[in-house]
């Protein structure tokens, strides 16, 4: 089931984030558990953040973190995804989490645009792109990373 994250979920979200990090193109950047925990606690408690978890059989098998921030050129805000990942056991729940985020962003006062990204290098970016397009998103560019040599 998908539900809004609670403070007690931080450790479970950390495990999901660690799993995602190991599969990402950024895996050479050391993950600092204390920093991750502190930032997740802020996200779960902040009204500017939207954190969902996929809970199956008592375990966190996916997480979504969205945030709003003021656009640098406007008084309007942008809602964007910071983290979006489901484990193999959580497969199939991603679209529902994304729909919940989009609904939250549209209901969030002052949001002028919703930005969705595909930037981790995990999984099939084409599949994620198709999901976003089915939800009405328009592709506007690409992301690049210079991996550590």
Q: Where are each of the predicted segments found?
A:
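C-terminal "cap" of GNAT-fold acetyltransferases
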Residues: 128-149
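Conserved beta-strand-loop-alpha-helix junction that forms the acyl-donor binding cleft
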Residues: 114-128, 147-148
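Helix-loop element at the rim of GNAT/NAT acetyltransferase active sites that forms part
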Residues: 15-29
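A short beta-loop-alpha structural element at the N-terminal edge
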Residues: 1-15
């Amino acid at each position: 089931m998908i539900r809004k994250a609670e403070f007690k979920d931080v450790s479970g979200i950390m495990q999901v984030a660690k799993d995602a990090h190991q599969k990402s193109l950024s895996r050479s950047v050391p993950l600092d558990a204390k920093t991750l925990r502190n930032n997740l606690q802020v996200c779960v408690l902040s009204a500017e953040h939207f954190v969902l978890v996929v809970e199956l059989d008592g375990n966190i098998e996916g997480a979504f973190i969205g945030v709003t921030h003021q656009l640098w050129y406007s008084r309007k805000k942008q809602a964007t995804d910071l983290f979006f990942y489901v484990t193999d056991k959580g497969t199939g729940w991603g679209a529902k989490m994304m729909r919940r985020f989009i609904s939250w962003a549209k209901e969030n006062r002052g949001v002028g645009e919703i930005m969705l990204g595909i930037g981790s290098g995990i999984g099939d970016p084409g599949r994620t792109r198709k999901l976003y397009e089915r939800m009405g998103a328009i592709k506007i560019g690409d992301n690049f990373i210079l991996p550590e040599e």
